[in-house]
């Protein structure tokens, strides 16, 4: 028992000594090098505290690529075509907002976003002679916004161009009536203007334009319009460049009604006229046409809108002076229906010519009829109806001396 006690006592002292030695190293580590004695077991890093694990830095966000903005028209542009769209195009970002407005009134112009928000395009027409501001805000991939403001002005009023169409909208005319367009300014870009005017026949009939000058163009088909149909005329001329800086200032759609087919066949040799309605003979009358010094024009003439129940004809209007052969001073007539600008009419013959109807040609180129015949024409024939004259040695009227278009072969009419 005593030996065992003696054996245990030294071991207890050894443990105390060892613990004391370790304590000294740890304390010393607080003020010196933090190294462990070589006789201590190595630490297991996999069991270390969370604070001793290496931290992982988050992946840095790359900087946003700067947005590039292209605006049309460019800032400060003058004489912008009001029919052209205003565009904002963003690259490396989107168009967050766009406001296009009249700088004087604040009136805004609508627009739409396209290409996933990268492009804004105006959707409404602009006004002539107006200053506009265009404020565009873009956003980059990080959501950072930037605003760009520009101004521009549109074409001044002095460069507006328009036209007048004959016949007027909703008018009813005969089957031979060409459509005529008279422009306020010379048209240089004729193909562009033709493309902007769409003419549709209810029967599908197709015609062609024929330019008589830079300000006048007409349109007709190869044959007369079908009776009792309609034409639709779409004039989409707003913003169309006529040339010389002139810009079309309107768009409009008009309808023209086509009535019965009414054709007068005038025969100078037979000294008579026959009138057909829808290819059926309606009336025939004795007539007097142009004499040998003033023969009637041959070919086709279209009735104009000029009708006079009572009219005074003056010889001076056809170039005759007092003392000239054929000078008649002035005469009063009834039921005058104009066929040409140069003075060809269908009218009631003068009292002195009445006995010669159907017998002798006495006129200065007009078609003289009885009171009954001239009255019937006055009441029953309308603008766009046609007169076809044969049996006379004279040439046809000029195409623009009234409507002499039908004297031109269609192949020639349709060519430039």
Model-identified regions with their sequence ranges:
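Actinobacteria-biased recognition of intrinsically disordered, low-complexity terminal regions
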Residues: 1-10, 413-416
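Acidic, low-complexity Ser/Thr/Gly/Pro-rich repeat segments typical of extracellular/periplasmic
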Residues: 2-5, 13-260, 287
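Soluble periplasmic/extracytoplasmic beta-strand elements of cell-envelope proteins
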Residues: 70, 87-89, 133, 151, ...
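Extracytoplasmic/secreted envelope proteins and their assembly/folding machinery
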Residues: 87, 133, 149, 180, ...
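Short, charged beta-turn/beta-strand-edge "cap" motif at the junction between a beta-strand
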Residues: 138-139, 237-239, 279, 309, ...
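Exported/periplasmic cell-wall-interacting domains
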Residues: 175, 298, 314-416
């Amino acid at each position: 028992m005593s030996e065992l006690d003696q054996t245990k006592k030294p071991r207890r002292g050894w443990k105390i000594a060892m613990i004391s030695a370790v304590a000294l190293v740890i304390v010393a580590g607080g003020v010196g090098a933090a190294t462990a004695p070589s006789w201590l077991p190595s630490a297991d890093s996999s069991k270390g505290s969370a604070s001793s694990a290496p931290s992982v830095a988050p992946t840095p966000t790359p900087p946003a690529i700067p947005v590039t903005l292209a605006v049309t028209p460019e800032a400060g542009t003058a004489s912008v075509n009001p029919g052209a769209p205003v565009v904002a195009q963003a690259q490396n970002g989107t168009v967050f907002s766009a406001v296009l407005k009249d700088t004087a009134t604040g009136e805004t112009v609508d627009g739409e976003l396209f290409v996933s928000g990268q492009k804004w395009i105006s959707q409404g027409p602009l006004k002539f002679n107006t200053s506009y501001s265009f404020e565009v805000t873009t956003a980059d991939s990080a959501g950072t916004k930037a605003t760009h403001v520009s101004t521009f002005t549109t074409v001044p009023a002095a460069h507006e161009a328009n036209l007048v169409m004959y016949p007027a909208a909703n008018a009813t005319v005969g089957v031979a009536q060409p459509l005529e367009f008279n422009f306020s300014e010379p048209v240089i870009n004729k193909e562009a203007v033709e493309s902007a005017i769409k003419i549709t026949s209810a029967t599908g009939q197709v015609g062609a334009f024929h330019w008589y000058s830079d300000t006048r163009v007409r349109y007709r088909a190869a044959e007369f319009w079908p009776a009792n149909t309609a034409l639709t005329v779409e004039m989409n001329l707003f913003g169309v460049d006529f040339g010389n800086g002139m810009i079309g200032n309107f768009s409009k759609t008009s309808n023209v009604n086509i009535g019965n087919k009414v054709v007068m066949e005038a025969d100078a040799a037979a000294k008579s006229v026959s009138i057909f309605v829808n290819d059926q003979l309606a009336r025939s009358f004795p007539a007097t046409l142009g004499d040998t010094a003033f023969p009637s024009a041959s070919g086709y003439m279209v009735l104009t809108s000029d009708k006079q129940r009572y009219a005074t004809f003056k010889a001076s209007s056809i170039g005759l002076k007092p003392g000239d052969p054929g000078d008649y001073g002035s005469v009063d007539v009834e039921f005058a229906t104009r066929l040409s600008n140069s003075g060809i009419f269908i009218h009631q013959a003068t009292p002195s010519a009445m006995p010669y109807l159907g017998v002798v040609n006495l006129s200065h180129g007009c078609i003289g009829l009885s009171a009954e015949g001239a009255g019937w024409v006055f009441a029953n024939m309308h603008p766009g109806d046609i007169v076809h004259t044969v049996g006379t040695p004279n040439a046809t009227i000029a195409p623009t001396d009234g409507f002499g278009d039908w004297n031109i072969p269609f192949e020639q009419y349709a060519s430039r």
